[in-house]
Amino acid sequence: MKILVAMSGGVDSTVTAYKLKNLGHEVIGCYMKLHGKPNYHEENIKKVEKVANFLQIPYHILDLQKDFKNKVYMPFVDTYKEGKTPNPCALCNRFIKLGKLLEFAKSLGCEKLATGHYARLENNLIKTAVDESKDQSYFLASADKEALKYLIFPLGEMKKEDVKKFASTIEVLKSFATQKESSEICFVEDTYVQVLDQFMDTKIPGEVLDSSGKVVGKHEGYMHYTIGKRRGFEVRGAHEPHFVLKINPKQNQIIVGTKEELKISEFKLKNINLFIDAKELDCEVKIRYRSKSTPCKVEIYEDKSAKITLKDPVYGLASGQMAVFYDHDKVIASGFIE
């Protein structure tokens, strides 16, 4: 089978290519240039070239910087401007890795696209990985349903520690096996505010309000805050921790309150991404990557919006983040929180 493998120069994508090549597939590597971070690509491309030569496979360098800027980078900036919390990895997977890269794979005549994600596929549904600590099904849940039939995740059945051990036994991979893992947003050097600083003044002090609308302090600029944050602002006379409950970007205000006030039992989604045919779901939902799943009921409307009612309340629900719905270990829907 002819398979395009997304290669980053890291351990996971390298082991993915190695495994598929050893199974006798016709493997082609592809490195994506997504952003202009200084010295980022040169080093990675050298690694990809080294692996490709070792495996004796061809590889391509695909410049997707324009698409990435339009579909991921600028929406990241704009979402923070709106006082919301973006999820750039979910957008990147849908539009870039499982979108533009899949188009490129098809243009080469490839039957499948393989990535180093920790997830599994079964009956055209994404499943959680065997290694729950590394499971990436949450970020893949933004994928177009039609893309799933072309995808392969060879590492989904492996534990991360076994991938590293496997990598350390192969000569060309030995220098990669001890690499620091990349877990942060790829185009953010230190903090997301540094990205926003390139486009606007983020340090415009504003008012801190309590939930009754009373001014109780000052903050350093609304873009420094996300829902649930409890530091970096002043609350006069507070005797208990206060958390950001809401952000008003037009007024440059943040509304704060107690942890109890952060509790939410119901929320709405727009443009729900369904992987099964349904108008109602009785399932579990994750409201952020590392959160535990919570039992819920989902009502889906004609305009693809949805209302979610939680069995138990959650804390710190952030508009702009992705909610992912599971039936046991299978992803059945996703959508961005309003």
Curated annotation (Swiss-Prot):
Gene Ontology cellular-component annotations: cytoplasm
Region spans: Interaction with tRNA: 134-136, 288-289
SS bond list: C92-C186
Binding site for ATP: A6, M7, S8, G9, G10, V11, D12, S13, M32, G116
GO MF term (any one): tRNA binding
Catalysed reaction equations from the record: S-sulfanyl-L-cysteinyl-[protein] + uridine(34) in tRNA + AH2 + ATP = 2-thiouridine(34) in tRNA + L-cysteinyl-[protein] + A + AMP + diphosphate + H(+)
E.C. designation(s): 2.8.1.13
Keywords tagged on the record: ATP-binding, Cytoplasm, Disulfide bond, Nucleotide-binding, RNA-binding, Transferase, tRNA processing, tRNA-binding
Record bears the keyword tRNA processing: yes
Enzyme class: transferase
Biological processes, Gene Ontology terms: tRNA wobble position uridine thiolation
Localization, UniProt: Cytoplasm
PANTHER family per UniProt: MITOCHONDRIAL TRNA-SPECIFIC 2-THIOURIDYLASE 1, TRNA 5-METHYLAMINOMETHYL-2-THIOURIDYLATE -METHYLTRANSFERASE
Protein name, entry field: tRNA-specific 2-thiouridylase MnmA
